[in-house]
Amino acid sequence: EAVEHELFSIELDSIAVKGKKDAVRIFTVLGNNDWVFHNTSWYFNQQQHDKFLIFYRKQQWTTAERFANDLKREWPEMADYYNIMLSRIEEYKKNSPGDDWDGVYRATTK
């Protein structure tokens, strides 16, 4: 519990690795209290990121793309992540995960 107050993180994804049924939620650490103090835009970016994940998991691809592209510009440290997610969105637009998709990325390779 002490870590929660010293480090700030965001959820990146929910992934099921090849051969596994259950998903694991993946997070990244953004920084500590000092980092937050010097990065005043982190809270806004975190809120926008949370909205991105909601639209992504609801298959609202156009809106998710808009959020990802905006966040890439506003949060350059996270640009590689958003590029990966934008690639996934493009793939999902071509091959829908289906109406019953639970928002979990299912890896096809190890």
Please give the residue ranges for each predicted region:
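Cytosolic regulatory/linker segments at or just downstream of nucleotide-handling modules
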Residues: E1-I54, K58-W61, D70-K94, G98
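Extended, hydrophobic beta-loop-alpha segments that form or line the acyl/peptidyl-thioester binding
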Residues: F67
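Intrinsically disordered, low-complexity, charge-biased linker/tail regions
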Residues: G98-K110
